[in-house]
Amino acid sequence: MTANVGINGFGRIGRLVLRIALSRDDINVIAINDPFIAPDYAAYMFKYDSTHGKFKGTVTHEGKYLVINGKKIEVFQERDPANIPWGKEGVDYVLDSTGVFTTIEGAQKHIDAGAKKVIITAPSKDAPMFVVGVNHEEYTPDIKILSNASCTTNCLAPLAKVINDTYGIEEGLMTTIHSITATQKTVDGPSHKDWRGGRTASGNIIPSSTGAAKAVGKVLPALAGKLTGMSMRVPTTDVSVVDLTVNLKKPTTYEDICATMKKAAEGPLAGILGYTDEAVVSSDFLTDSRSSVFDAKAGILLTPTFVKLVSWYDNEYGYSTRVVDLLQHVAKVSA
């Protein structure tokens, strides 16, 4: 059964979600809404991408439509989601990638406009969060508004799940070394809630807060209250890396941890969790569709119960792939 989809917000995630969705036979993207992007500009932004390269296909625009490989996708420019004619256009599922409507109250506007389900492509304070490969099978059809959590939670959760299932986690601290995102500044500018966040993105390492580690406790209740973390924003355009330092319940060796991660990556979490023992750097993971790639050569064990683990993720492309995976799962369960 084909899922009829609308995308609200045509930024980094919205455009990559569309690229990925177009490759799936059971997804039909009908419309896009972005108050700041007209159809001609949407075509340009979709066609050319400084990070992931030029779109391999034809991209044009005709009037109010974005035309990709001959397929017409209507472009709306409504500021208020309640005014987007999702119902009239036959859209059942909305992917909200604005970063603005992240609560149930905000996302409800899409339902009011005729959509049946909304997936928020950001963490949410009150909508249930799902991470593919970790807790997505707990989704039930009565849930109309849900969150795909954050890119960092999608990297950390599969890693933490495997470690906790095998050795048990007493407690842990996470640091994500995170690439620049659109909210940062090209030169020093005002940022009243986060003063450091207002400093030049391309010339600084910027400590920042993140709820990604605590959010793991929402998708893995066994780890609630056991993980927290922070972020270091660094001057790279894409690909980030999680550094997870944990106290384990069960003593082990680093070699055994690597074997456990490799087994999980080749088994139940294939395509979501990856494994590498090569001398890789961040750019080697550009446009990698996996949520998390465990780096066997980067971690270190101090004692049999105290270990630092490292896992890479394309915070744009890997995350966008999971958004589409979650959409497919929701559509299948809801059919």
From Swiss-Prot:
NAD(+) binds at R12, I13, D34, R79, N315. It catalyses: D-glyceraldehyde 3-phosphate + phosphate + NAD(+) = (2R)-3-phospho-glyceroyl phosphate + NADH + H(+). Pathway: Carbohydrate degradation; glycolysis; pyruvate from D-glyceraldehyde 3-phosphate: step 1/5. Coiled coil: none annotated. Signal peptide: none annotated. It is found in: Cytoplasm. GO terms for molecular function: glyceraldehyde-3-phosphate dehydrogenase (NAD+) (phosphorylating) activity; NAD binding; NADP binding. D-glyceraldehyde 3-phosphate binds at S150, C151, T152, T181, T210, G211, R233. GO terms for biological process: glucose metabolic process; glycolytic process. One of its GO terms (cellular component) is cytosol. Its EC number is 1.2.1.12. InterPro entries: GlycerAld/Erythrose_P_DH (IPR020831), GlycerAld_3-P_DH_AS (IPR020830), GlycerAld_3-P_DH_cat (IPR020829), GlycerAld_3-P_DH_NAD(P)-bd (IPR020828), Glyceraldehyde-3-P_DH_1 (IPR006424), NAD(P)-bd_dom_sf (IPR036291). The active site is at C151. CDD domains: GAPDH_I_C (cd18126), GAPDH_I_N (cd05214). PROSITE patterns: GAPDH. The record marks H178 as: Activates thiol group during catalysis. Homotetramer. Belongs to the glyceraldehyde-3-phosphate dehydrogenase family. This is Glyceraldehyde-3-phosphate dehydrogenase. The gene is GPD.
